[in-house]
């Protein structure tokens, strides 16, 4: 069995893959340890052109090599802040109103993908399989093919794939999808995402979709599939129970003074429906006066992309809403909303989930939402909390024991909170058991192993007539001065 090569925008360091690492890092690292391999991507550092060209930096942990490169300021601005997060992220989350398109940012996005491919080629061996992750790397396989790589290359999209009517708002949409079709296997989180991609192929790419998720488009044959990412529920349950007697939990219980607790944890992002959530909680306090002083919402929302104006605005909006609602409903000994704009250790969060009566997870659009799955897994089986979950989270299709809501309906969310707060223990246990059965059936290991099994089953590409192959020997395209034309832009 060949090595696994994982490529992602950011690489979790060896330290980060242990301890409190998130589900994806744990799952990917587990697969890498099984076969040996490389985790390749951006280090998170913005560096000079000289330092960027000198990479990748290699760090070894057993049979796993962590290979990272830095980005120049221009590449960071165009590839990451620009096209990835100012164009693709909003459009793929159905927020065309927040998207912008700049040709130079799109050019930078493609340039960085080509440069990353050029860096990776030197690390490849003939029987490696390559697994790229997420929207930052849509053209990455095309860039590898241009380098002569014939290895199996798979792609998994962690965020939603938008309907064709939304996607075509990006001017180079056809070029992007054509690049995406250079992968051998494209994995989606949900049936809806896969169907949206198939719809685009048939309507706009003049391609065909055949049984089994097989696609023919742009002169390529590829496979598509639905692979619902999961968690390791029993591990989470064990850790949540272990942490429930820690001081931070005792402090929270003491401060609540017997009040019910609603927990929400999200990155500070407009796709998460945070303002709508606060307004639904306000509806609860307004429509059910008996809950005033008797229930607290804790919203943990660590900052993300703080240098992007859209994210600065959502932070301001959320702070305003929290202040307004607290100003209206607080008492001398009661604050309805505790809004924390900071990061918490993952295992601390699991123990807080276990302490709460409701998990309130209501994104406007989300690929899967692992917080919803972690909330369920962290519960006490004898006295579980209730998950109130958006119908637009990918997890809603699996977690049918949840109270499913429309995040645009504040009254409907309020009614779900009322129901959850009053739900008898036998119903809560029944719903918890339904959700846990789903988590165990399709845990993180199943997601990982099923995807990699399908990728390994894809037929290998035939080598190009010039003998180029997947060993890393494919020649880089050169400019007249002899430098690769995909070298990083100067800072």
Per-region residue spans from a language model:
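Catalytic cores of carbohydrate-active enzymes across secretory and cytosolic contexts
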Residues: 1-491
């Amino acid at each position: 069995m060949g090595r696994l090569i994982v490529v992602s925008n950011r690489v979790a360091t060896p330290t980060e893959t242990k301890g409190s690492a998130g589900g994806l890092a744990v799952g990917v690292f587990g697969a890498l340890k099984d076969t040996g391999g490389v985790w390749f991507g951006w280090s998170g550092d913005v560096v000079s052109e000289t330092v960027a060209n000198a990479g990748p930096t290699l760090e070894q942990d057993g049979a796993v090599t962590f290979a990272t490169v830095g980005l120049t300021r221009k590449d960071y601005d165009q590839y990451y802040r620009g096209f990835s997060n100012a164009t693709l992220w909003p459009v793929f989350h159905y927020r065309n109103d927040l998207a912008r398109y700049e040709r130079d940012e799109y050019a930078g996005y493609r340039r960085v993908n080509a440069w990353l491919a050029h860096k990776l080629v030197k690390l490849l061996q003939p029987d490696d399989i390559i697994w790229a992750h997420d929207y930052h790397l849509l053209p990455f396989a095309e860039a590898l093919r241009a380098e002569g790589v014939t290895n199996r290359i798979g792609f998994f999209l962690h965020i939603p794939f938008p309907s064709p009517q939304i996607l075509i708002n990006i001017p180079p949409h056809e070029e992007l999808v054509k690049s995406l079709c250079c992968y051998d296997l494209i994995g989606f989180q949900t049936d809806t995402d896969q169907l949206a991609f198939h719809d685009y192929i048939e309507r706009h790419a003049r391609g065909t979709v055949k049984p089994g998720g097989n696609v023919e488009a742009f002169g390529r044959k590829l496979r598509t599939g639905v692979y619902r990412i999961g968690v390791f529920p029993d591990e989470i349950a064990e850790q949540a129970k272990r942490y429930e007697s820690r001081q931070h939990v005792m402090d929270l219980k003491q401060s609540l003074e017997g009040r019910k607790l609603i927990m929400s944890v999200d990155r500070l992002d407009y796709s998460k429906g945070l303002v709508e959530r606060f307004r639904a909680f306000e509806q609860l306090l307004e429509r059910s006066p008996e809950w005033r002083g008797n229930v607290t919402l804790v919203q943990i929302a660590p900052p993300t992309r703080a240098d992007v104006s859209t994210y600065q605005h959502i932070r301001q909006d959320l702070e305003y809403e929290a202040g307004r609602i607290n100003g209206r409903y607080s008492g001398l000994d009661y604050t309805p909303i505790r809004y924390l704009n900071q990061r918490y250790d993952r295992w601390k969060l699991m123990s807080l989930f276990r302490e709460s009566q409701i998990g309130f997870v209501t994104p406007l659009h989300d690929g899967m939402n692992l917080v919803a799955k972690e909330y369920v897994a962290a519960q006490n089986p004898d006295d579980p909390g209730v998950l109130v979950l958006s119908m637009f989270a990918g997890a809603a299709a699996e977690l049918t024991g949840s109270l499913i809501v429309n995040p645009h309906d504040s009254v409907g969310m309020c009614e779900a909170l009322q129901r959850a707060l009053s739900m008898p223990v036998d119903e809560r246990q029944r719903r918890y058991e339904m959700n846990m059965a789903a988590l165990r059936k399709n845990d993180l290991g199943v997601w990982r192993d099923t995807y990699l099994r399908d990728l390994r089953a894809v037929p290998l590409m035939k080598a190009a007539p010039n003998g180029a192959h997947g060993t890393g020997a494919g020649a880089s395209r050169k400019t007249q001065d002899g430098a690769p034309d995909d070298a990083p832009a100067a800072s």
